[in-house]
Curated annotation (Swiss-Prot):
GO molecular function: endopeptidase activity; serine-type peptidase activity
Pfam families with a match to the protein in the record: CtpB_N-like (PF22694), PDZ_6 (PF17820), Peptidase_S41 (PF03572), PG_binding_1 (PF01471)
Cell location: Cell membrane
Taxonomic lineage: Bacteria, Bacillati, Bacillota, Bacilli, Bacillales
Official protein name in the record: Probable CtpA-like serine protease
Coiled coil: none
Topology in membrane: Single-pass membrane protein
Active site: residue positions: 329, 340, 354
Segments for region (Disordered): 1-27
Domain PDZ: 124-206
Biased segments, Polar residues type: 18-27
Length: 496
């Protein structure tokens, strides 16, 4: 084995202090957290990187590799013998790599732990890209909309921008091959590749279609965004990756330069990431020598403390942290520390509640094992696993911003009884249509509103909630979410 790391993160296209399964948990039913790009990402598949944000935590418990006892050795010998027998004597030829992976997967599955998993070499690569925030590609954010792959925006200074790619460009081919019917992640995989190699995109812009050659480069995706909203500085932290602490420090300094005294740290739908980054970020606001998080394994505990003086420009700032049920892991470590030291007031809704830390061990073949090794507590000793952190002031998320994705493989009509019908009603109500109940029944009144929706959006008027209606419904909810961040607006009004 090569590196041993402790992770506190989530997963591919997700991650946090624990594992790459965090998003799968918070979105087990594909729950939509309507927070700007996050909402788009979940609802219509916007993706810039397929990131497994893992956490490199602290190795604090000195472990000695001891010899196996007789029982363990016997079990290991048995596994080895079964592998050899099946690999050599089974009547059909077996793939030795698949047998090995199946054995490992079986052991991990037996843990019944959603945060422990074995990653292949390819999965490990994605996982590490999530940790670093770096990947090789063209730097264009894409989304799937109405069965088309569309560029949302090229990153500033990226190869895509330099090549002339524009927002709303529709990609029809990659390297001369049609992408019709392909999933968004498949297209992203095709667009990516080795550094300094070229990819040719066939782009449709209006009635014009042309080929654009773009050289792939290493792209860094920033995890922090700063905006000035009146007299309040809003710093959005999307994940905890390499140098998120540096990005946060820069954002705080910009806010100070702008003369702002009130800062909102927006951690909504932040699944976590690197634990050491969470500690460094807390150190911006918490003085030297203070405990940020306590790690515990059995009877062994260690307090991880700040190592530097806090940022002087942040000392007089009024800090507010905005969280929701999608804020997990490293987000909770950071929030818990600032809350315990009264350095920030917490707003929003209760956080996810992930209080365990994973360790990663990477093997020589590039694969990786991630497993839960310890739990963590806040400085005051609060164990938030399964409980979350309650905000000091609750700001409820509008119902339409927490909808489950409606599968577009099914059509709903009068007489149907389905949980997705409640989602349809909530969404239509948010879009201004008259809905008098939120039951799971598709009644005549709902049919009338669906017809009105279809007519207003120039769709075939059937009264049935079909694929085309669903796509437009989703698109309009996304637009509404992007135009109106109700929760953030409420918080800014509170802070005025």
């Amino acid at each position: 084995m090569d590196d041993k790391q402790h992770t506190s993160s989530s997963d591919d296209e997700r991650a946090e202090i624990a594992t790459s399964n965090q998003d799968q948990e918070t979105n087990s039913s594909k729950r939509v957290h309507l927070k700007r790009w996050q909402f788009i990402s979940i609802l219509i598949g916007t993706t810039l990187i397929t990131a497994v944000i893992t956490v490199v935590a602290y190795i604090f418990i000195n472990q000695k590799i001891s010899g196996l006892n007789k029982t363990d050795q016997a079990n290991l010998n048995k596994i080895e013998n079964v592998y050899k027998i099946l690999n050599s004597d089974y009547y059909k030829k077996q793939d030795s790599d698949k047998l090995s992976k199946a054995a490992i997967d079986g052991m991990v599955k037996e843990l019944k732990d959603p945060y422990s998993e074995y990653l292949t070499k390819e999965q490990t690569k994605s996982f590490n890209e999530g940790v670093s925030g770096d990947f090789v590609g063209i730097g264009a954010e894409m989304q799937k909309k109405n069965d088309q792959i569309m560029v949302t925006s090229p990153m500033k200074g990226s190869p895509a921008e330099r090549a002339g790619i524009r927002p709303k460009d529709v990609i029809t081919k990659v390297n001369g091959k049609s992408i019709k019917g392909k999933a968004l992640d498949e297209v992203v995989k095709d667009v990516r590749g080795k550094e300094n190699t070229e990819v040719t995109l066939t782009v449709q812009r209006g009635s014009e279609e042309k080929d654009v050659k773009i050289k792939r480069e290493k792209i860094h995706v920033k995890s922090v965004d700063y905006k000035k909203k009146g007299k309040v500085g809003v710093i959005t932290i999307n994940k905890f990756q390499n140098d998120t602490s540096g990005e946060l420090k820069d954002a705080v300094l910009k806010a100070h330069k702008d003369g702002l005294k009130k800062i909102v740290l927006d951690l909504r739908n932040n699944p976590g990431g690197l634990l050491d980054e969470a500690v460094k970020m807390a150190n911006i606001f918490i003085d030297k020598g203070k405990t940020v998080v306590k790690l515990e394994k059995g009877k062994d505990t260690e307090a991880i403390q700040t190592s530097n003086d806090s940022l002087k420009e942040a000392k007089d700032m009024d800090i507010s942290i905005l969280v929701n049920e999608g804020s997990a892991s490293a987000s909770e470590v950071f929030t818990g520390a600032l809350k315990d030291y009264n350095k920030a007031k917490v707003y929003g809704s209760k956080t996810f509640g992930k209080g365990v830390v994973q360790t990663t061990r990477e093997f020589k073949d590039g694969s990786l094992l991630k497993y839960t090794e310890m739990k963590w507590l806040t400085p005051d000793g609060h164990y938030i696993h399964g409980k979350g952190i309650k905000p000091d002031v609750t700001i409820d998320t509008p119902k339409y911003q927490s909808l489950n994705v409606i599968p577009n493989t099914k059509t709903f009509k009068v007489g149907d009884d389905d949980k997705n019908i409640k989602t349809i009603k909530i969404g239509l109500s948010a879009l201004g249509y008259k809905v008098d109940n939120e039951s799971t029944q598709f009644d005549q009144a709902l049919e009338n509103q669906v017809k009105a929706f279809q007519q207003a959006n120039k769709l075939e008027v059937t009264g049935e909630f079909n694929k085309e209606t669903n796509n437009k419904f989703t698109e309009l909810l996304v637009e509404k979410a992007n135009k109106h961040d109700d929760v953030l607006d409420k918080l800014i009004n509170i802070l005025k």
